[in-house]
A protein has these predicted regions:
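An acidic, Gly/Ser/Thr/Pro-rich helix-cap/linker signature
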Residues: 1-24
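C-terminal region detector
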Residues: 3, 10, 188, 203, ...
Length: 322
């Protein structure tokens, strides 16, 4: 990723309690479930798109940041998750085409909702509307974050911390897994990456019963405090106590990823016939102009060939190497 600014997107507990979703009547449990559900979509889609883990991690952080400023009632969680994956893939220099992202999310929705898996046709107006919505949501993401998309993950600190603490090798993978799971929570918008890294190292050490230095306290060497580490462990424990997150319909703009209230196919928004005629006329005019240019170009090439054959006394032009 290209770092353009300092990572300063952090909120207090009071700000999270007064989130835009809460103001729209969405309770804390529903908001937590939708956050986990959206992060699950980002993680699963990243695997299907064969993206590196850094892309999924960045996408999940962008997802949490966006819903700290916007409500789940106004922006569909599935479409925002798709835009986060698309934007994160570009930020982490592993870009994917919009068509690939849309096809993957369409397939995931069919499998999760037990619907017949149908191929997403990329030619009808519905696909054009989906692609337009993907672009529109990406612009919303960038606008709400002031085009500052710098993300610092705890993963890069974990290896250094474990090496400094001289912990056993099995602790590394466990800490890495906990860091991935922490991205499903709001820890990334509450604490700096160093604190989250210390928290997951502490949780992994307790799980494997590995003692860590306490005199002096080991976390002070990494600019962390005990209260922050305890909160990270508490949030992770609460996450593991929750059932698998399922989609909860709260958005006013429709619940499906592939259908929208703004669809071109909606009878409430008919397409003017005059517009269709004008578009067809423009298309026909472009075709005629293109054919004319091709014919004119062919005539010019023929004239050049005739001149060359006359110049070189009837020797066929294809004998010469240009």
């Amino acid at each position: 990723m290209i770092y353009t600014a300092i990572d300063t997107f952090y909120l207090t507990d009071e700000q999270l309690q007064n989130s835009p979703s809460r103001k729209d009547g969405i309770d804390e449990a529903t908001e937590t479930t939708l956050r986990i559900y959206g992060c699950d979509l980002i993680q699963e889609s990243g695997i299907l798109l064969k993206l590196p883990q850094a892309v999924m991690a960045t996408g999940q952080v962008l997802f949490h940041r966006f819903y700290c400023k916007k409500s789940f009632a106004r922006f569909n969680v599935k479409r925002v998750a798709a835009s986060c994956v698309w934007l994160a893939s570009k930020l982490e220099e592993s870009p994917r085409k919009a068509r690939q992202v849309l096809i993957v999310f369409h397939r995931m929705e069919c499998r999760r909702e037990n619907l017949p898996i149908e191929h997403l046709d990329t030619f009808p107006k519905k696909y054009a509307e989906l692609k337009m919505d993907l672009n529109r949501t990406e612009r919303h993401l960038l606008k709400e974050m002031g085009f500052i998309c710098h993300v610092e993950h705890p993963h890069k600190f974990i290896s250094n911390y474990l090496a400094a603490l001289e912990t056993p090798p099995e602790l590394r993978q466990e800490s890495w897994n906990l860091a991935n799971d922490s991205l499903r929570t709001t820890l990334c918008v509450r604490f700096k990456s160093e604190v989250v890294a210390c928290g997951v190292v502490y949780a992994a050490a307790r799980r494997f019963q590995v003692p860590l230095p306490e005199n002096p306290p080991w976390w002070k060497a990494f600019d962390a405090d005990k209260s922050g580490i305890d909160e990270v462990c508490r949030v992770l424990a609460h996450l593991y106590s929750l059932p698998k997150a399922k989609y909860i319909p709260v958005c006013k703009d429709g619940d499906s990823f592939t259908t929208s209230n703004k669809s071109w196919d909606s009878p409430s928004q008919p397409v003017p016939k005059e517009g269709i005629q004008i578009n067809r006329s423009i298309i026909h005019l472009e075709i005629v102009n293109t054919m004319a240019r091709l014919i004119q170009g062919t005539r010019i090439v023929t004239d050049i060939i005739n001149i060359l054959e006359i110049r070189f006394q009837g020797v066929p032009v294809y004998h010469f190497k240009f």
